[in-house]
Amino acid sequence: MLTLAKIALISSLFISLPFARPQKQNPRRNVTQHTIEDVKIMRNNSIHLERSINVTSENGSDISNLMVTTPSPLNLSTTFRTTNSTRTWLMTSSSESSRPSSTYSVPPLVQGFVSKLPLNSSTADANPLQVSEHSNSTNSPSPENFTWSLDNDTMNSPEDISTTVRPFPPPPKTTPVTPFTAEPTEWLPTNNDNFAGFTPYQEKTTLQPTLKFTNNSKLFPNTSDTPKENKNTGIVFGAILGAILGASLLSLVGYLLCGQRKTDSFSHRRLYDDRNEPVLRLDNAPEPYDVNFGNSSYYNPAVSDSSMPEGGESLQDGIPMDAIPPLRPSI
């Protein structure tokens, strides 16, 4: 429990620091400092926290004095400095039916600490108040008109201020915030030099008509296409003519080759064309011919007759020429 008490004391110190920061003093606000030296001993692990809230109203100013004393088993004196919170309202003078109430919330402390606060305020309560762990004091002003001033940064409120203490904090209220959008109802003036040449209206751009291209090749033939067409026609005609000439040449070569392969025909030819040419005589041969040789030699009785002397001629010693028909005229 001693360790728990130390932890609670340290946590309360750190939590109460933002509420004890010194601020700019206002002549209509008072700052009080109290030094506490009284420390009591813990009893049966049940300690109560007594808190006294002093609220004074001086010329419309709110003063809240918060004093907290935590006892320690070591009897150590602890000094807390509480500073009255100063609220500065930067608003113009206006009158409203009701303003949001100022709420002072006490940080959560461990239940079980006992403290006594000195009663140094004129409006302090006679009896100490016992507050639970989550206690808060709410100052609700009466629904009257408030006056706000920018000169002295003060708030004037009626003297009738009621102090209420609630054992449990009310549930947090969330107020929906609607974003404010301002739309100009008329055109802004353009007298400034920065707007020179600026037109408030939206410029409309006119679209030029698109150009349509039509194919007039049939109506007006292009001269550049004529040579190409003629060239293509010439190529086709030349290919056809070349094929014909090639076929003719091949047929001619084949004909000539086939004509030379024919065999030569037998032709009769005369032994002599001139009658004055001497005729070959068979009797001049050194040996006598065989008359029976293939029955191709003519009969010569002078050769076959061996009784005849050599060199002797007989009447029948020549070739008979009477039977030879007359010569035909040469063609």
UniProtKB/Swiss-Prot annotation:
Residues 23-233 are extracellular. Residues 124-186, 302-331 are annotated as: Disordered. It holds the Pfam family Mucin15. The chain crosses the membrane at residues 234-254. It is found in: Membrane. Glycans are attached at residues 30, 44, 54, 59, 75, 84, 120, 136, 145, 152, 215, 222. Residues 1-22 form the signal peptide. GO terms for cellular component: membrane. Highly glycosylated (N- and O-linked carbohydrates). Residues 255-331 are cytoplasmic. This is Mucin-15. It comes from Mus musculus (Mouse). The gene is Muc15.
